[in-house]
Amino acid sequence: MVRSKRQMRLGLFVQAAGHHVAGWRLPKAEAGGENLALLQRIAATAERGKFDMIFLADGLTTAKDAHPSMVARLEPLLLLSALAMSTSRIGLAATVSTTYGEPFHVARAFASLDHISNGRAGWNVVTTSYARSAVNFGRQHPEHDERYAVAAEFVEVVRGLWDSWEDGAVIKDKAAGRYVDTDKLHVLDHVGNISR
C-alpha cells in the first residue's frame, strides 16, 4: 500500500491592528490595516514563507468597545486586489456576507479578483450574526434559520453566475471583430426567494 504524501496547508489571518488587543502598542509593532505598503510586505513575506492563503475577515458594523481590528479595516476585496499585484502564488480569501450582499455584486467582485490574481480568489461565506449590522442597511436582522436559508440560495446563485460564462468565452478575434463568443454566454434563469 502506497501512502499519499500529506501536507499541511497554512493560512495567514491578517488583522488590521494585530490579533492581541494591545499588540499594536508594542514599541516595534508595525500595525496598520490601512497601510497598503505594510500589508504588501506582509503578503510577500507570507508567500516567501510558503503560506497557501491570506485571509481577511470582514464585518458590517462596529462598536466603540470593539477590538481595534474590527474598527480600522479596509474593504477586503479591494484590498486583496491590491495585494494580488504584489504576490503571484498565495491564495487571497475574504469574508463577504450573504445576508447583506447581493449575489450579482458578490459574483462579479470575486470573479474580478479571480481574474486579476490569476485564479487565487477565495470566499469565506458568512451570514452575519451581529444584529446591529442591520441598521447600516435599513433592514431588520433576520433570524438564524432564515439567514442560512438565504445563504444556501445566495451561494447557488453566485455559482450559477460564475458558470454563466464558459471557459474560452473571451476570444478577442480582431479579424472577425468579435471580442466575446456570445454562444458561450448564458443567462442565469434563477427564480427563487432572494433573486429573480
Enumerate the language-model features and the residues they cover:
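Active-site mouth loops of central-metabolism enzymes
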Residues: 22-37, 94-104, 140, 145
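Hydrophobic faces of well-ordered beta-strands that scaffold small-molecule active sites
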Residues: 8-12, 54-56, 90-96, 119-125
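Generic structural signal for helix capping and beta-alpha/helix-loop junctions
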Residues: 20, 63, 100-102, 131
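Low-complexity, flexible helical/coil segments
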Residues: 44-51, 88-95, 127-133, 157-163
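N-terminal beta1-alpha1-beta2 module of alpha/beta enzyme domains
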Residues: 1-87
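Active-site beta-loop-alpha junctions enriched in small/polar residues
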Residues: 15-17, 59, 97-99, 126-128
